[in-house]
Amino acid sequence: MPPDDRLLMLPTSKTDNRPTTITKLTPFTKQLYTLNKPAKCLPTLSSLALFVGAMLTPLCAQAALPEAIQTALTHAHLSTADISIVITPVGDKDASRLPAPIQVIDSTKPANQPETLTTDDGTAGPSSIQKQALKNNNAKEVSVHQSPLMTIEKQTIKQHARQLHAYTDDPYTYQSIESIPSLLPENALVSAKNHNSSIKDSAKDNESSKNNNDKSTAHSPVIKISFSPLLSHQANIARTPASTMKLVPSFIALDTLGADFVWHTRVYHTGIIIGDKLYGDLIIQGSGDPKMTHERLQQLLYKVQSAGIRHINGDIIVDSAVFKNVTKDPAAFDNSPLRPYNASPDGFLVNFSSIGIQSYPLDNTRAQLTYTPQLANYQLPSMINIRSAACGQARYSIAPQWQPTQLTLNTNLPNSCGEHAFYVAYPDAKDFAARVIASKWQTLGNTLSGKVISQETPYSANNTSDKQTKLPRGLAAIAMSPLPIVSYPSLNLTQQIYDINHFSNNVMTEQVALSIGAYNSTNNPINKAGSNKINTDKASTNKESVNNKSSDTNKVINNQATSLYQFGQPKATDYPQALQTINQWWQTKLTTPPPHLSNGSGLCRDCSISAANLSELLTYAYEQPSFDAYVSSLGIAGVSGTISAHSERLPKSQAIGRAWIKTGTLNNVTSMAGYVKGLSGQDYVVVGIINTDQALNAYNARTVLDTMLDWTAQH
């Protein structure tokens, strides 16, 4: 981030953030300043008073960083000015809301060693953990809290990571698209849920008992414990957060839409169905579903087929009007338009607008290529030559380039790739969706006489279509208003934000952020007949994948109060509206000013948030009903998600299996934020953000924040 950009960042606190001691000393020092005028010796006294006041400032306000963190900063060639940290205790240590810790064991150790938490001595029991905490903290004795532990083999984690990186150049996109099961054993997930459920049930029982006893009396206010930060360093400086910004829309969505919220993609038809043939158009009304993978799209089309339609004498219209004007230049951010993380959101996003290219070597000179999903009326090369080279990202290994009617590969496949999956983003979400739909419809054995038309405007119920002339005699008089045939629910929000925070899925985050604006009940109540009609923006685009030369115009609707097609639909939204809804939520629920956002995923250099802001959000989330879904979406330090390499960078960290973290990385940004369960049983909110004016060494910078997690876990 350029140096001058920091001066443009929004303020991050409404209140005077001067240390309390300094504030209280201000009147006294002013009096000293007045007294120093007649006597030359008094300026020294005034300076001394200010110095004493500064020395009395609380540790959390002007803290020297812990030695371990300072050492890591020095090793990374970073200064204390480059980092903001806030670490705050949260909740009651006897009623933790965090999942049970994960015990990472190493069976390669001698069999006579106990399989307990990893420490500097390899493995050790509670007493040695306590000694290690004392050694590292140089502090008073820590009472080690015994939490129920789930176990997983260290070698299992390593093997899983090796297999992923050997198989694909983009393991996070692969895991999102293919819905790869969690590495953790199922009983670990169930235990964590039961652990938190028992706490919530106990709280409900207590609340119910209280209500029964106090029905005749006024309800007394709930007293919440407020902790001072364990460590606060440059907490109020606005910084670029990178992907830790995903924590903002993902929680606000949970809080406003609910953990069980689902998107409903609805299918309508015009005309009439005779036998298994539709004389009219099939309309797919996009809902903004973040995870309409190619397999789920095929299930949607299969439901249409099961409803009795196999042949369409008309067009398939894709209505993506729920989001408007959200398409971006995929090369604008970092000149990497082929990377799936740069894909644009869309009202009907299919497979993250990305295609999987699988290589299968036939011999030492050639390899066969397959594609998932297939694209209708688009040429995809089936063979590629092999060269001697190391396997890397798609842009280096196969150098793909999207042409109007074909994909070209501008280099030969490295021989070290073997059977490998590359993920490449298509440049146009609407054209991609249209081509995949056409291909899937045909794969199911169905036919389509017209085209697949993807547009950012609703279908026209009263459009004068030339297909009316194709109807059998006498059917032209039948009303053409769209009629519902299929409603296909998405995965619920809890499942969606798992991908967002565990695999740092950018385009899914954008879909969720936009959905906050579209589905928020406060700003967009369920549509009633004749109200909140979908805006038909004149700038909306029209994509026709099957025949790009077609002169057909958009089939735009004049909203009618009696149309089932518009009933119950959310109001169309765009980024300004969605981000305003996020700001309104923040101003209502929290005390600090909202972050500065230009999108939801953190893939931006003009976005900013302070460590104090993010810490307040995480602290608020900890107390909310949707917290289980939120914390379960985060990666586990040294175990899973984008923080799984924590144990490789810091093998003896006490945070392994005890920290639930979202990470963020840009070329000059490294960040981590989430929750840590201390050895004492106390839960902590942790936020660390590193910004520099030039590109930084990401590995070394991450180690600084790894050390922050380790230091916190020792408490």
Task: Give each language-model segment a name.
Residues 85-87, 265-267, 673:
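Short beta-strand scaffold segments in enzyme catalytic cores
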Residues 233-239, 423, 601-604:
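A short glycine/serine-rich beta->alpha loop
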Residues 231-252:
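Short active-site loop at a secondary-structure junction
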Residues 64-76, 110, 141-193, 215-225, ...:
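Conserved serine DD-peptidase/penicillin-binding transpeptidase domain
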Residues 2-12, 43-125, 129-135, 140-201, ...:
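N-terminal leader/targeting segments and the immediately adjacent pre-domain N-terminus
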Residues 1-40:
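N-terminal secretory signal peptides that target proteins for export/translocation
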Residues 93, 246-253, 316, 348, ...:
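Residue-level preference for non-acidic, small/hydrophobic
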Residues 503, 513-524, 562-715:
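Small-residue-rich helix-loop
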